[in-house]
């Protein structure tokens, strides 16, 4: 089933396996797809003499991973091909104790402290770019905590199950039969959600750890990586404290405007940032969520969930921005159940259906063009009296027969039963007339909101909560610098963020040698 060239590459990946790995396969011999499923598993087993297969008879195809005869808690219902192929390879490597995605001791301790038996099911689409991160993070948790299991489910094979659960977006994670998470996520986010859902013993058992540095960079995107590297090159002790390396870059598919790099992907750029960071003596603490800060003293304090505290005389805030929501009543109820932010991931659920795209910038029009290829009808709603997208995109969308564009239109309400979206209410801003549009789904593309909540009560921010910086990236507080999309710098671009991060680091170093901090 797998191409010979791919199998050769996989052989190289598994060349260092030391544990005995068993793929325990359950299959229905009467299923017409049984031979294809079995062929896939046998192909994987053929890549290493450390991997073998065993077969059991059952209703549905699935297989679990055993290490030295013991269950790891990781299983797959469906063939983990497409974007999930990496999830399978990493699951086997991680089972053997290998892989750069394995967390540090502090995060592992939190995973081990989760309470009770935790049975996870992660519903995915094999074309979803956000799904592998979630599957891989939950697989790691299963390996660390024997009370956790995670089953990847190919939603395309189990449509009845998808409809019964009213899943309209992927990845969708269920814990012990109840919804836990929908959409993009990483180890840190998922761990926090599980701690809130099932409880944890960690807070009572945790040892409070204080880590001291010369410079602490908050955020691991282009601005944060640049700032950390520039600071480390000055011989300073530097730490990055971030939810994930790469930041929002991870959610970008194609990147063609990073000067000197003709074309790359967000995932690749995030990996390249980590590789570059690792070239220097920079301590990376990812999967961390900042819960409190004290930035007004000479020695700044940053506390993260899990009991760690970081202190330094200089802080660079490079926490980036997140997708802006509509800010409408009941919006939380419909996210993942009709309201979405990723057309690539969730668009396939709306094949042959009617959807709307809110936002007429480049992201919104690109989303409309993508969705037009699979949806019956796409309605684009732009708040302003003109679209802001590039002319070439406007021309393209105008040529599509199943796309309709409305300007000067404000979305005022989400309509539905609280579980499933059925439409939206919009207002024509030229005459204040309202009307309802029946829809199956809506994709929100209205820009970004700065991730400044942990700092906005201490440093000066704009009414939009962007951190105000001067030309040298200094904020209103001595020893506190900021860079990238979280700030007032115009034009939120990767190239600009990298330059801003470098400026912030150089300003911090300049203040240090002049005795300002």
What are these regions (language model features)?
Residues 3-42, 111-146, 152:
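Local sequence-structure signature of Cys/Sec-based thiol-disulfide redox active-site neighborhoods
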Residues 49-58, 146-160:
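Thiol-based oxidoreductase modules, predominantly thioredoxin-like and allied folds used
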Residues 55-74, 159-176:
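Structural micro-motif
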Residues 67-99, 174-202:
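Non-catalytic, surface beta->alpha helical segment in thiol-disulfide oxidoreductase systems
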Residues 115, 121-126, 130-132, 136-138, ...:
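Beta1-alpha1 glycine-rich phosphate/pyrophosphate-binding loop at the start
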Residues 204-212, 319-374, 468-471:
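Glycine-rich dinucleotide-binding loop and its adjacent helix/turn
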Residues 270-305, 309-312, 317, 372-471, ...:
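A Rossmann-like FAD-binding core segment of flavoenzymes
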Residues 322, 327, 333-349, 438, ...:
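FAD-site-proximal beta/loop scaffold in flavoenzymes
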């Amino acid at each position: 089933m797998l191409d010979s060239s791919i199998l050769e590459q996989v052989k190289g990946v598994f060349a260092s396996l030391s544990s005995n790995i068993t793929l325990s396969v359950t299959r229905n011999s009467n299923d017409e797809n049984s031979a294809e499923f079995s062929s896939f598993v046998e192909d994987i087993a053929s890549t290493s003499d450390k991997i073998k297969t065993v077969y059991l008879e059952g209703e549905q195809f699935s297989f679990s991973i055993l290490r030295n005869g013991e269950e790891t808690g990781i299983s797959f219902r469906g063939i983990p091909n497409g974007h999930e192929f990496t999830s399978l390879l990493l699951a086997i490597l991680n089972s053997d104790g290998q892989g750069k995605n394995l967390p540090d001791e502090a995060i592992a301790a939190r995973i081990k402290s989760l309470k009770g038996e935790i049975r996870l099911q992660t519903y995915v689409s094999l074309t979803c770019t956000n799904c592998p991160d979630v599957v891989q993070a939950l697989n790691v948790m299963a390996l660390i905590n024997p009370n956790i299991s995670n089953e990847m489910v190919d939603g395309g094979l189990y449509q009845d199950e998808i409809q019964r659960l009213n899943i309209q977006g992927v990845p969708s994670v269920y814990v012990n039969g109840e919804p836990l998470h929908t959409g993009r996520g990483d180890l840190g986010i998922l761990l926090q959600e599980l701690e809130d859902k099932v409880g944890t013993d960690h807070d009572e058992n945790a040892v409070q750890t204080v880590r001291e540095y010369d410079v602490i960079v908050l955020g691991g995107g282009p601005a944060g990586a640049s700032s950390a590297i520039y600071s480390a090159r000055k011989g300073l002790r530097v730490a990055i404290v971030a939810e994930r390396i790469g930041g929002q870059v991870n959610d970008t598919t194609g990147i063609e405007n990073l000067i000197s790099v003709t074309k790359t992907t967000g995932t690749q750029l995030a990996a390249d940032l980590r590789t570059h960071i690792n070239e220097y003596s920079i301590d990376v603490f990812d999967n961390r969520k900042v819960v409190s800060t004290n930035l007004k003293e000479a020695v700044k304090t940053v506390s993260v969930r899990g009991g760690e505290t970081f202190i330094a005389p200089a802080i660079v805030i490079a926490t980036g921005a997140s997708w802006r929501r509509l800010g409408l009543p009941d919006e939380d109820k419909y996210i993942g159940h009709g309201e979405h932010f990723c057309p690539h991931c969730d668009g396939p659920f709306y094949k042959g259906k009617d959807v709307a795209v809110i936002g007429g910038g480049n992201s919104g029009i690109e989303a409309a063009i993508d969705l037009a290829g699979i949806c019956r009808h796409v309605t684009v709603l732009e708040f302003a009296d003109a679209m802001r997208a590039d002319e070439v995109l406007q021309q393209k969308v105008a040529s599509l027969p199943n796309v309709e564009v409305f300007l000067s239109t404000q979305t005022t309400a989400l309509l539905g039963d609280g579980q499933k979206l059925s439409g939206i209410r919009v207002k024509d801003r030229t005459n204040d007339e309202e009307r309802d549009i029946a829809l199956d789904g809506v994709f929100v593309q209205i820009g970004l909101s700065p991730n400044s909540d942990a700092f906005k009560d201490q440093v000066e921010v704009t009414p939009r909560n962007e951190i105000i910086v001067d030309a040298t990236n200094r904020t209103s507080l001595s020893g506190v610098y900021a860079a990238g999309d979280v700030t007032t710098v115009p034009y939120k671009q990767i190239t600009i963020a990298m330059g801003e991060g470098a400026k912030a680091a150089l300003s911090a170093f300049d203040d240090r040698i002049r005795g300002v901090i």
